[in-house]
Amino acid sequence: MKVLILSCNTGGGHNAAASALKESLNFYHHEAEVLDLMSLGRKHTSALVGGAYVKLVSVFPAGFGALYQLGELVRKFPWKSPVYYANARLGNALADYIDQNHFNAVVTTHLYPAETLTWMKQKGLLTIPCVAVATDYACIPFWEETNCDYYVVPHKDLIPEFASCGIPEEKLLPLGIPVRPAFARPASKEDVRRHLGLPENAPLFLVMSGSMGFGKVHLLAHELVSRLENGEQAVIICGNNKKRMRSLRLQFHKNPNVHIIGFTRHVAEYMAAADVLFTKPGGLSSTEAAVRRVPLVHTDPIPGCETKNRAFFVSRGMSVTGAHQKELAEAGISLARDDARQIAMRDAQQKNSHPQAGTSITHLLEKLVSE
């Protein structure tokens, strides 16, 4: 079986889910390719789309929230959105790519390719199975105007929400968000810390700011580090935000208990090493934390779907949060020093996560292709 996995460079989560699914397909001896849909457009289209997203959410996150709310209004109209028509323009190029490379199925971890695939189906240009994977704990605007064969959602409790938006319930499968097997693999905290060069026995707080280093990490770091006691450690991962990494290293260069990290491919290991994790409520990073079963503090969300992700986790005891940086730091400190609360949170995460989502989606695709 040969599968095309479509994504889009608007944040790291969609690409990470696509890569995790590719890893699962490869494990079962299937061929898989991850493709940024926008790379089929004009030169620099992918960079422009991804760059615009990064600029908006980093410089003016409230603007992204306003666009999300506008989408909530537009979705109520009885016609297709501008998002649909913008992505439909890539339909012919995608149809040619699928035909030329002889794929047996196509999966998308992003809304935009789902819009393109919908246009292709309407025009009779798509004859292979197509599956959409939702990577947020909410039915974001415009999923309802797509027409994929199946929709993989993160949790069974989200089926009513997606169905109420207009997606047929029989198409909704609560298989979870795919994450790399490394997040589900048992790991000794001491061994992982030794491998990462971290103290083996001291309580350790991990602060993550997402793949592009968003959020008020410098403020949270100040509040957290000022509360550390008795050799407690803080590891701060800045993602691709090199400016922030340099600033934090300058701020804490005299503190041996603070470790500033840039982009890393060892997130699963750092999560395994942590006693408490602080991260913004991205759908993918939150799922990785739940699968890893690490006590979780959700920090400031990008307004819109991340606000809903955080609400979903907090309401099920899978994370805690706070209204401002001081409150977030205090929530994490309190959680780290309360074994009973940590156990309860890990149990809630285990109950509500799907570590084998990639495997489940792989078997779904095998079934669809064989029919």
What are these regions (language model features)?
Residues 341-355:
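A short, well-ordered alpha-helix in the C-terminal region of glycosyltransferases
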Residues 190, 199-273:
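Donor-nucleotide binding loops and adjacent catalytic segments primarily
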Residues 315-320, 324-340:
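C-terminal "capping" alpha-helix adjacent to the active site of nucleotide-linked donor transferases
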Residues 149-204, 208-211, 241-243:
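A nucleotide-sugar donor-handling region in carbohydrate enzymes
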